[in-house]
Amino acid sequence: MSLINLAFKKVKTEKRPALLTYTVAGDSTKKKSLEILKSIAKYADICEIGFPHNTPIADGGQIQSSAYRALKNGIKIKDVFSIVKNFKKSKQSKPVILMGYYNMIYQYGDNNFINICKKVGVDGLIVVDLPYPENKEFAKKCKKKDISFIQLVSPTTSLDRMKKIIRDSHDMVYYISMLSTTGGKLKVSPKKILERYGKIKKLNKNKNIVIGFGITEKTIASLRKADGLVVGSALCKEISNSIKKRQNPVTNVTNIVLKLRKKIS
């Protein structure tokens, strides 16, 4: 069983959703971003790590600021791999899902990129701009190396398309809860999100389905019926605030992750 599936199995026995954190590799520095990962892993179940990108189409202002800081610090794709490798070596490591855009993979070539991911210990991949069914070949290549390719579904995904995506998905499916960039205010009520979520879940009760976009300390408890919840913008915002106030982002971000974990435990 994959580490991602094991993480979901563990939280089910604890009768709570998995907490997935998202941070940008290299924010605020390469060293600090590794320290943040090691620290938040005490309370997170799965760690999503974003490739900093100069035009991240799906990312809201907070994540764009994080990506900008990382790029300004000269972070390269090889540095992202090095952060993952060092994190996976640590005692408190958790399953890692890398999230990015296809042009970065294209520079390396699919097979080369997937081989490096395997070597450094990546458990899953989300490629934001490689939708289904165009991603089928790439997903197959990932599966061959025991890397989970994570499909995305949204409120506008048709039922027929949704069925196919869920059928072909690997360890989990990422449900984008609302049509906006990440970190937007929750324009849809948690009740409505869970209604839609329930319809997706009915298609395959055994599939792990996580909710992302708009999840904060205020909204997380009301969504705890989901298999997993992804929090990213709130963490990136805390890194920005810590830098502005000249405080240690490691401590501040960890405190937020601990609070989030308590709200769903």
UniProtKB/Swiss-Prot annotation:
Pathway: Amino-acid biosynthesis; L-tryptophan biosynthesis; L-tryptophan from chorismate: step 5/5. CDD domains: Tryptophan_synthase_alpha. It catalyses: (1S,2R)-1-C-(indol-3-yl)glycerol 3-phosphate + L-serine = D-glyceraldehyde 3-phosphate + L-tryptophan + H2O. SUPFAM superfamilies: Ribulose-phoshate binding barrel. Its EC number is 4.2.1.20. The active site is at 48 (proton acceptor), 59 (proton acceptor). Disulfide bonds: none annotated. One of its GO terms (cellular component) is cytosol. The keyword S-adenosyl-L-methionine does not apply. Pfam families: Trp_syntA. The keyword Lyase applies. Gene3D superfamilies: Aldolase class I. Keywords: Amino-acid biosynthesis, Aromatic amino acid biosynthesis, Lyase, Tryptophan biosynthesis. It is an enzyme of class 4 (lyase). GO terms for molecular function: tryptophan synthase activity. The alpha subunit is responsible for the aldol cleavage of indoleglycerol phosphate to indole and glyceraldehyde 3-phosphate. Tetramer of two alpha and two beta chains. Belongs to the TrpA family. This is Tryptophan synthase alpha chain. It comes from Pelagibacter ubique (strain HTCC1062).
